[in-house]
Regions:
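A short beta-strand-loop structural module common to alpha/beta enzyme folds
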Residues: 90-103
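A short, glycine/small-residue-rich beta-strand->loop->alpha-helix junction that serves as a flexible
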Residues: 68-76
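SAM-dependent nucleic-acid methyltransferase catalytic core
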Residues: 36, 40-46, 63-64, 87, ...
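A short, charged/proline- and glycine-enriched loop
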Residues: 49, 53-61, 125-127
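Glycine-rich beta-alpha loop elements in corrinoid/cobalamin-binding modules
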Residues: 100, 111-226
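Residues that mark the start of a beta-strand
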Residues: 58-63, 67, 92
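Helix-enriched interaction subdomains in cytosolic or periplasmic regions
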Residues: 1-39, 88
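Histidine-anchored nucleotide/phosphate-binding helix
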Residues: 46-52, 75-87
Length: 226
């Protein structure tokens, strides 16, 4: 959608920290100021891979929720997606959640990605795939800001042109009801996600990760993999 006069607003991604050491230092310094003393950032939950496996992974996947940890911690959906991904040889998985609203300013002030891997303390730009789990349509209102404030461009063409940006895919119970994410925002400017996975994750998501691994191994670009 264009503004009055046909001027396209600038929607540039935020400049975020990419150095894990700097993010860890921020975390150690400010954890007590986070909601619930940062319980939503602790990571290392049961069945989560240890960070020691990060370096040897051939494909790194961040499973991201559009709701807060408090709201979805008991959900089985992202845990199942993570388990499916872990079963693909060479894949490392971490999880990220919508931060509690009162933590936004603290994270933005220091350039910490709003989507932050709870175990790795890495933002989406450190991963190969950003897998967004969408349960209900209302959650999608959080998507543009979470992308931008995590350093991820909104437009597919820019994401495809930058090797440091992960493939952005969306799945989940609501994935078949996401027409708002499809099509072009302006001529030549596809919007928000690179692909939507519809169907049983046990089959579709596993196969997607296998295709990405194969493509990476052959030196294909993200666009060629898609």
């Amino acid at each position: 959608m264009a503004e009055a006069g046909g001027v396209i607003p600038t929607l540039s991604p935020a400049r975020v920290l990419s150095d894990r050491g700097a993010i860890l230092e921020w975390y150690r310094t400010h954890r007590a100021a986070l909601s619930g003393h940062g319980v939503w950032t602790l990571g290392n939950e049961p069945n989560v891979q240890p960070f020691a496996l990060w370096a040897s992974a051939r494909l790194r996947v961040l499973v991201a929720r559009l709701s807060t940890y408090r709201d979805v911690a008991a959900s089985m959906s992202h845990a199942l997606v993570g388990q499916i991904a872990r079963e693909v040889e060479g894949v490392y998985v971490d999880y990220a959640y919508l931060p509690p609203p009162r933590n936004y300013d603290l994270m933005r002030r220091f350039g910490v990605p709003l989507w932050l891997g709870t175990t790795t303390k890495q933002g989406p730009l450190a991963f190969d795939v950003l897998g967004i789990s969408n349960s209900i349509s209302a959650e999608l209102l959080n998507l543009p800001n979470l992308l931008l404030e995590s350093g991820v461009p909104l437009f597919k063409a820019e994401r495809m042109s930058r090797p440091d940006v992960p493939l952005v895919i969306l799945g989940g119970a609501n994935s078949a009801q996401t027409a708002i994410l499809h099509g072009e925002w302006d001529r030549g400017r596809a919007f928000l996600v690179d692909a939507v996975i519809v169907g049983e994750a046990e089959v579709a998501f596993r196969r997607f990760l296998q295709v990405v691994l194969e493509g990476k191994g052959r030196g294909l670009t993200k666009q060629e993999i898609l």
